[in-house]
């Protein structure tokens, strides 16, 4: 079971992932609220409550709906806020991690 790796402002290299945390908007970046962010591979028990959805859905199902085949899911980073899955590139940001106030936003970019 891979561990979470804490992320710091600026550029982060975690395995094959190159991740940037910044307060500057960027194309394809995930807009999230500030906090203790970390990254890890997806886990079977992960789920997200996407804004406007009718409740929590499994990440497995969300990835499948977006056409990510099972053999590629381990390559998808899961960004965690305070240890909980909160944002996934190509899927979205959990309602709990959406920025509460304009200007108080962190942008997570994957290269």
Q: What spans do the regions from the language model cover?
A:
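AMP-forming adenylation/ATP pyrophosphatase catalytic core
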Residues: 1-111
């Amino acid at each position: 079971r891979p561990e979470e790796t804490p992320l710091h402002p600026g550029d982060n290299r975690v395995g094959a992932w190159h991740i940037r945390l910044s307060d500057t908007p960027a194309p394809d970046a995930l807009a999230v609220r500030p906090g203790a962010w970390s990254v890890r591979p997806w886990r079977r028990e992960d789920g997200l409550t996407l804004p406007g959805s009718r409740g929590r859905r499994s990440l497995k199902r969300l990835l499948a709906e977006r056409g990510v085949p099972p053999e590629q899911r381990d390559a998808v980073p899961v960004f965690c806020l305070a240890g909980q899955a909160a944002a996934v590139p190509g899927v979205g940001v959990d309602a709990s991690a959406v920025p509460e106030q304009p200007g108080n936003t962190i942008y997570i970019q994957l290269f």
